[in-house]
A protein has these predicted regions:
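ATP-dependent carboxylate-amine ligase
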Residues: 2-165
Length: 165
């Protein structure tokens, strides 16, 4: 919607306060400061939609937003509705991840097995199989004061897990 405004209206004439109350919709890049007992995590919730292009841009933003010294983790869910290109495109996102500054990568879903197998060995975390393993990752396995980006298609259910934390 911003691109429509930019392309069709004189940007200089727009009210400067127009976007002050704009909030990022849940599961589309929203940031959750999660605390349970003494553990604190910053979770970037990108769990509503995923395709190779949105994945690449979300990962680039995640990389550039946080310092290189920060502990950064990635939870990747299946990208769905890719048809016959699904395997190839899940492999392709491994290339983006391998170039990133992420410390460890965890995957969830059968299709992300293709991604996991193409990751550099030193950043491979674990392939997670169910909601309990995801909650254990968030509540127990990740170090305190770390950053986690969750990216996957809506129907993987990752967004429901994150929203219910």
């Amino acid at each position: 919607s911003l691109s429509i405004i930019i392309n069709y209206f004189d940007i200089e004439k727009l009210n400067k306060n127009l976007f002050l109350d704009f909030n990022i919709p849940k599961s589309r890049g929203s940031v959750l400061n999660y605390k349970k007992r003494s553990k604190k995590l910053t979770i970037v919730d990108e769990s509503y939609n995923s395709n190779p292009l949105s994945f690449k841009f979300a990962l680039e933003k995640f990389d550039s937003t946080y310092r290189e010294s920060d502990k950064k983790f990635l939870l990747v869910g299946n990208m769905l509705e890719l048809g016959k290109y699904s395997k190839k495109l899940h492999i392709k996102i491994a290339k983006y991840i391998n170039k990133s500054k992420v410390n460890k990568v965890y995957t969830f879903g059968k299709l992300t097995e293709h991604t996991f197998n193409k990751l550099k060995p030193q950043i491979r975390g674990k392939m997670l199989n169910n909601n309990k393993e995801i909650l254990n990752l968030i509540n127990k396995d990740l170090p305190n004061n770390s950053f986690l980006m969750v990216k996957g298609s809506n129907s993987t259910g990752l967004n429901k897990i994150i929203q219910n934390l």
